[in-house]
Amino acid sequence: MSLSGPRIGRAHQQQGDTMAINVEPALSPHLVVDDAASAIDFYVKAFDAVELGRVPGPDGKLIHAALRINGFTVMLNDDVPQMCGGKSMTPTSLGGTPVTIHLTVTDVDAKFQRALNAGATVVTALEDQLWGDRYGVVADPFGHHWSLGQPVREVNMDEIQAAMSSQGDG
């Protein structure tokens, strides 16, 4: 069993006396939070996450968990400073996060509201953007930022550049 992503549920191939693991390249965010169990509950409520599994350490803190959000794997664990050179790695302890996790969704208004109802706060209000998406950003209760966007109109690069240029005229 793997809690690392796309190979979950994939068939393995027999090679001699050993099983070869069928690995598919992937990119998955791995979030560090205070209270990973509560974070899992939040992500289920806010983003309709499906829990793939969790691994508690001897003290009950989660040393690893995996979720499926919007069709992709997101991994997370409780903050374990001793695994990071003695440093806490949560967004709260670091004074914020430079990373925003983006979800392209359908019915962005409902999904944005669902995240707010689950306890997220607005970072950037949901609005139609010059690049053609209806887009907004929320912060989860654990300090991670999530942008939600839905393409609502086709635009070309000339339109985007013209819109950017006109923003300076004012």
From Swiss-Prot:
Residues 25-151 form the VOC domain. InterPro entries: Glyas_Bleomycin-R_OHBP_Dase, Glyas_Fos-R_dOase_dom, VOC. This is Uncharacterized protein MT0910.
